[in-house]
Swiss-Prot record:
Functional note: Component of the large ribosomal subunit. The ribosome is a large ribonucleoprotein complex responsible for the synthesis of proteins in the cell.
Protein's gene: Rpl6
GO cellular component: A band; cytoplasm; cytoplasmic ribonucleoprotein granule; cytoplasmic side of rough endoplasmic reticulum membrane; cytosolic large ribosomal subunit; cytosolic ribosome; large ribosomal subunit; nucleus
GO molecular function terms listed in the Swiss-Prot or TrEMBL record: 5.8S rRNA binding; mRNA binding; RNA binding; structural constituent of ribosome; tRNA binding
Protein name as it appears in the record: Large ribosomal subunit protein eL6
SUPFAM superfamilies in UniProt: Translation proteins SH3-like domain
Localization (cell): Cytoplasm, Cytosol; Cytoplasm; Rough endoplasmic reticulum
GO terms of biological process kind: cytoplasmic translation
Main location: cytoplasm
S-S pairs: none
Source organism: Rattus norvegicus (Rat)
N6-succinyllysine modified-residue sites: 104, 217
Length: 298
C-alpha cells in the first residue's frame, strides 16, 4: 500500500503533461518568419490583381452604355436611405410688423363708431413729370476705380516693341504706368523719333533687354490729363469768308518739348554706356519667312 501511495503522485504529475501535449497538438504549428511574410505578400498580390470594374461599360470616351436612370436601377440606389445633415443654426427672430393703420373711435351715432386711419399720410401733391430713380449698381465700379494690373514682364526700363499705331515695329523704353493703366514710353526721340507717349500693354511685346533708369527723375505732371488731346475749334462760316476759312492745326507746345529733353537727357547716357544698345533701339522689328512669333525669344 505504501508503494501504491507513492505511485499516485507520479500519475498526477503526468496528467498536466498530457494536457499540455494535447494542447500543443490542437494548436497550429509555428512557422518560420520568412514563410509568414511570403504568405502576406501573396495575399496582397491577389488583392491588387483584381482591378475595380465599372458596371457601366464605356462605348466611347465619356459615353457609357447605360444611361443615368438605368444605372440608378442597376445599382439599386433606390434602396439607400439618405438623411439630411442636421444644422445647429439658431432660428431667426421674427421682426415685429410695423402697423400701417390704426383704428380710432369716432363720435356720432351714424359714423360707425370706429375709423381706420393711415399712420403714414400720402403726399398732398404729386410731381407733374416722372423723375427717374437711380438704380443700385450690383458691385459694378466705374472705370476710375478699376484695379490697374501690370504684366510681370514689364518693369521700369524694359525695352518694349510697339505693335500698333504709327510707331509700330519700333523699340521704346518703358518709364512708368499711369493712373488709367496705360504705359508711358519714350524712344528716346533722338534715336527712333518716338516721343513721350502713352500705349496699352496689350499691344506691346516685352523683351528681356533692360535699361537702368533707377536714377532717372520723371516729372510728376506727366499724367493722363497731360497727354489728353484738346478738341480743335472749328471756325464758323461768316459772310464773305466761306472759302477762306482754315482749320486749326495741332501744334506741339513748348512744355512738351522741354519735358522731352529733360527725360531723354537722363536716359541717353545710360543707353550709350551699353554697347550695341543704340543700334538695337534704332532698328525696327519685323517678321520674315520662316520666323514664327510663338517660337521667338525676345
Amino acid at each position: 500500500m505504501a508503494g501504491e501511495k507513492a505511485e499516485k503522485p507520479d500519475k498526477k504529475e503526468q496528467k498536466p503533461a498530457a494536457k499540455k501535449a494535447g494542447g500543443d497538438a490542437t494548436a497550429p504549428r509555428a512557422l518560420p518568419a520568412g514563410a509568414v511574410k511570403k504568405s502576406s505578400s501573396k495575399a496582397k498580390k491577389l488583392r491588387k490583381s483584381k482591378p475595380h470594374c465599372s458596371r457601366n461599360p464605356v462605348l466611347v470616351r465619356g459615353i457609357g452604355r447605360y444611361s443615368r436612370s438605368a444605372m440608378y436601377s442597376r445599382k439599386a440606389l433606390y434602396k439607400r436611405k439618405y438623411s439630411a445633415a442636421k444644422t445647429k443654426v439658431e432660428k431667426k427672430k421674427k421682426k415685429e410688423k410695423v402697423l400701417a393703420t390704426v383704428t380710432k373711435t369716432v363720435g356720432g351715432d351714424k359714423n360707425g363708431g370706429t375709423r381706420v386711419v393711415k399712420l403714414r399720410k400720402m403726399p398732398r401733391y404729386y410731381p407733374t413729370e416722372d423723375v427717374p430713380r437711380k438704380l443700385l449698381s450690383h458691385g459694378k465700379k466705374p472705370f476710375s476705380q478699376h484695379v490697374r494690373r501690370l504684366r510681370s514682364s514689364i518693369t521700369p526700363g524694359t525695352v518694349l516693341i510697339i505693335l500698333t499705331g504709327r510707331h509700330r515695329g519700333k523699340r521704346v523704353v518703358f518709364l512708368k504706368q499711369l493712373g488709367s493703366g496705360l504705359l508711358l514710353v519714350t524712344g528716346p526721340l533722338a534715336l527712333n523719333r518716338v516721343p513721350l507717349r502713352r500705349t496699352h500693354q496689350k499691344f506691346v511685346i516685352a523683351t528681356s533687354t533692360k535699361v537702368d533708369i533707377s536714377k532717372v527723375k520723371i516729372p510728376k505732371h506727366l499724367t493722363d490729363a497731360y497727354f489728353k488731346k484738346k478738341p480743335l475749334r472749328k471756325p464758323r462760316h461768316q459772310e464773305g469768308e466761306i472759302f477762306d476759312t482754315e482749320k486749326e492745326k495741332y501744334e506741339i507746345t513748348e512744355q512738351r518739348k522741354a519735358d522731352q529733353k529733360a527725360v531723354d537727357s537722363q536716359i541717353l547716357p545710360k543707353i550709350k554706356a551699353v554697347p550695341q544698345l543704340q543700334g538695337y533701339l534704332r532698328s525696327q522689328f519685323s517678321l520674315t519667312n520662316g520666323m514664327y512669333p510663338h517660337k521667338l525669344v525676345f
